[in-house]
C-alpha cells in the first residue's frame, strides 16, 4: 500500500451526545429533518426568518475571497442558507477534527442544495474571541517513536482573547512541525503556516489567516468571531440576554435539573449568579462574565461608550449565530452535541429560534508505514489504545519457550502446594484459620507477578526496535493517549500526501451528509464502518476504547 486510508469512524462522545445522534430526547433537541422534503421545509423556514441583508452586515468579518467569496455571494443573492461549524484557535490550525468539521459543513451544504434547490454555503466560525490560551497554544505531531506535543508561550498576560493575544516565539514549534512532515509532496501547507505565523501577529490572527488560505479554495468561508462587525450585529441580542439574565438563568437551572434527572451529566456546569455575556474593555484586556445582579444595569446603558465590548459565552454563541446568519444547521462535535441540550433552553428564554445541531463526520487516517507496522507485528489497533498492552504481549511472545514454561510451572506448583498446606491445616487441630494460607498465597502471587513484570521489562529492553515501532504506531493512532483526530495536526498529512487526504476526507464526509439528509439508519456510514470492523474482529474495534482528549470545544 502506497497511499493513506481515510476511514470513517463512529463519533463517540458522552451518553448525552449519543442520545442526540440517535434522535432521542426530543424535548432538548430539535428534530433533525428526516427526508429531502423535511430539509426543504427547514431551509424555507430559515429563509423566511432571516433578513435579506445579513451578508452586508457581517461581510468584513468574513472577508471571503475566491471560491468561498463567490459561493457566499451566490447564496446571499438567492436568499439561501448556510451550514455552519466552528472551533476555537489551535496551534497551526489545531487537530484533524478542525478539518473534519469544515469538510462536514461543506458536504452537508452541497447535499442540502442538491436535495432542496435552496442555495447553501458552508461557514466556519473561528472563535477568536475565546480566551483559552491553554487550548490555543498546542498541537501534536506523529514522529518515529511516538507523538510530540508542540507548544508556544503566551506573548502577554493570560486573560485576553486570542484575537488580542500576541503570538509568542513560534520558531521551535515550527521547526518541529517541519521535521514531522518529513518528505513532502505538497509544500503549500507549510508555506501557509510560514506566512500566517509571522512576527507581530496574534494567536487568533494567525489561526484565521491559515484557515482562510486553506479552506477558501474549497468554497468554505471563515468568519472572524472577534471582528467588530460581529460585535455590532450581536450587540442587540447580547443586551437582550442581559436584560433577561434572570429568565435565562431560571431556564438553564430547570434544564440542568431535567438532564440530571434523566441520568445524564450536563456538558457545561451551571455557574450560579453569572449571566451568559462577557465584557472586556474596548482597548483590550481581560474578559469578565457579567453577574446577573449587574446585567439589567449594563443592558440599560445600551451603547454607552463607557461600557466595554460584549461577547457571548459557549451556550449563548450558537443562539447569536443562528440569529445573525441564515443557519440551517450547525455541524457539531460530540461535546457540542452534549451542550446543545442546554443551548435549546437559552433560545426560547430570549424569544429566539433554537439552532439545529447535527453530528459531524469522524475519521482516522492510516498512513502506509503505520499499516505496515500493524501487519508486521500482528497488532490490533485497540491494543494501542491502552498503555503497555501491545508491548507486554509482544515482549512475552519474545521470551524463550523454556522461560515461559518455567514461569507457568512455578505458578502451578505454588498453587498446588498452597492447596496441600491448606488441606493439611484443615485436617489438623491447630488453632489457625485457613485464611492465613490464602493470604500467604496472595503474597507469593504478588511476588511472582512482580518477577514476571521484571522479566517482561527485560524482554522489552532487548526488543528495542519492536518497542519503537509500537510507539510509532501508537503515536500515529492514539497520540498522547487520545484518538488521532483529537490531537494530531492535519498539516503533516497534507504535506506528505497532497490532495489525496482531503479528497478522501471529502468522500467520507459526503457519504455522511447523504445519511444526514436521508436519515436512513441502513445508510449510516459510521455505523456501517463500526459493524464491519466488529465483524472482522470482535476485540479490535479502534473505537471501542473511548479515549477522549482535553480538547473542550469539540470534545
Task: Label the model's feature ranges.
Residues 37, 210-302, 397-555:
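Long, compositionally biased intrinsically disordered regions
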Residues 140-169:
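A glycine-rich helix N-cap at a beta->alpha junction
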Residues 265-328, 332-345, 367, 555:
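A translation/RNA-centric and nucleic-acid-associated enzymatic feature enriched
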Amino acid at each position: 500500500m502506497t497511499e493513506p486510508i481515510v476511514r470513517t469512524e463512529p463519533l463517540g462522545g458522552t451518553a448525552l451526545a449519543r442520545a442526540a445522534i440517535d434522535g432521542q430526547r426530543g424535548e432538548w433537541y430539535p428534530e433533525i429533518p428526516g427526508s429531502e422534503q423535511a430539509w426543504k421545509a427547514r431551509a424555507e423556514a430559515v429563509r423566511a426568518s432571516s433578513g435579506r441583508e445579513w451578508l452586508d452586515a457581517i461581510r468584513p468579518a468574513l472577508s471571503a475571497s475566491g471560491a468561498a467569496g463567490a459561493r457566499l455571494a451566490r447564496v446571499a443573492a438567492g436568499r439561501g442558507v448556510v451550514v455552519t461549524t466552528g472551533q476555537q484557535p489551535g496551534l497551526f490550525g489545531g487537530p484533524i477534527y478542525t478539518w473534519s468539521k469544515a469538510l462536514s459543513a461543506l458536504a452537508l451544504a452541497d447535499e442540502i442544495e442538491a436535495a432542496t434547490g435552496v442555495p447553501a454555503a458552508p461557514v466556519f466560525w473561528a472563535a477568536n474571541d475565546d480566551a483559552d490560551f491553554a487550548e490555543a497554544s498546542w498541537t501534536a505531531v506523529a514522529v518515529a517513536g511516538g507523538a510530540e506535543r508542540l507548544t508556544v508561550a503566551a506573548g502577554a498576560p493570560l486573560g485576553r482573547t486570542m484575537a488580542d493575544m500576541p503570538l509568542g516565539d513560534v520558531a521551535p514549534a515550527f521547526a518541529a512541525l517541519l521535521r514531522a512532515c518529513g518528505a513532502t509532496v505538497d509544500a503549500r501547507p507549510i508555506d501557509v503556516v510560514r506566512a500566517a505565523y509571522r512576527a507581530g501577529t496574534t494567536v487568533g490572527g494567525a489561526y484565521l489567516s491559515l484557515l482562510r488560505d486553506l479552506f477558501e479554495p474549497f468554497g468554505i468561508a471563515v468568519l472572524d468571531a472577534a471582528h467588530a462587525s460581529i460585535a455590532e450585529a450581536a450587540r442587540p441580542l447580547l443586551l437582550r440576554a442581559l436584560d433577561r439574565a434572570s429568565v435565562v438563568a431560571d431556564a438553564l437551572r430547570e434544564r440542568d435539573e431535567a438532564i440530571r434527572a434523566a441520568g445524564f451529566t450536563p456538558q457545561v456546569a451551571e455557574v450560579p449568579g453569572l449571566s451568559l455575556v462577557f465584557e472586556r474593555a474596548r482597548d483590550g484586556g481581560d474578559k469578565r462574565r457579567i453577574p446577573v445582579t449587574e446585567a439589567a444595569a449594563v443592558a440599560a446603558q445600551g451603547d454607552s461608550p463607557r461600557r466595554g465590548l460584549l461577547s457571548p459565552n459557549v451556550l449563548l454563541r450558537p443562539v447569536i449565530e443562528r440569529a445573525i446568519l441564515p443557519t440551517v444547521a450547525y455541524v457539531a462535535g460530540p461535546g457540542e452535541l452534549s451542550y446543545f441540550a442546554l443551548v435549546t433552553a437559552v433560545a426560547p428564554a430570549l424569544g429566539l429560534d433554537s439552532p439545529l445541531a447535527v453530528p459531524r463526520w469522524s475519521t482516522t487516517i492510516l498512513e502506509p508505514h503505520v499499516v505496515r507496522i500493524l501487519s508486521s507485528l500482528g497488532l490490533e489497533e485497540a491494543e494501542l489504545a491502552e498503555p503497555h498492552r501491545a508491548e507486554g504481549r509482544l515482549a512475552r511472545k519474545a521470551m524463550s519457550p523454556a522461560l515461559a514454561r518455567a514461569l507457568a510451572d512455578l505458578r502451578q506448583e505454588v498453587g498446588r502446594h498452597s492447596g496441600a498446606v491448606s488441606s493439611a491445616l484443615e485436617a489438623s487441630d491447630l488453632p489457625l484459620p485457613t485464611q492465613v494460607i490464602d493470604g500467604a498465597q496472595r503474597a507469593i502471587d504478588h511476588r511472582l507477578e512482580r518477577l514476571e513484570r521484571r522479566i517482561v521489562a527485560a524482554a522489552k529492553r532487548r526488543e528495542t526496535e519492536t518497542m519503537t515501532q509500537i510507539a510509532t504506531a501508537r503515536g500515529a493512532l492514539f497520540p498522547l493517549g487520545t484518538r488521532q483526530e483529537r490531537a494530531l495536526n492535519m498539516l503533516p498529512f497534507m504535506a506528505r500526501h497532497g490532495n489525496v487526504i482531503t479528497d478522501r476526507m471529502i468522500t467520507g464526509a459526503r457519504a455522511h451528509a447523504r445519511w444526514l439528509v436521508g436519515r436512513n439508519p441502513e445508510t449510516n456510514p459510521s455505523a456501517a464502518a463500526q459493524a464491519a470492523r466488529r465483524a472482522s474482529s470482535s476485540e479490535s474495534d479502534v473505537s471501542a476504547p473511548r479515549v477522549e482528549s482535553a480538547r473542550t470545544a469539540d470534545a
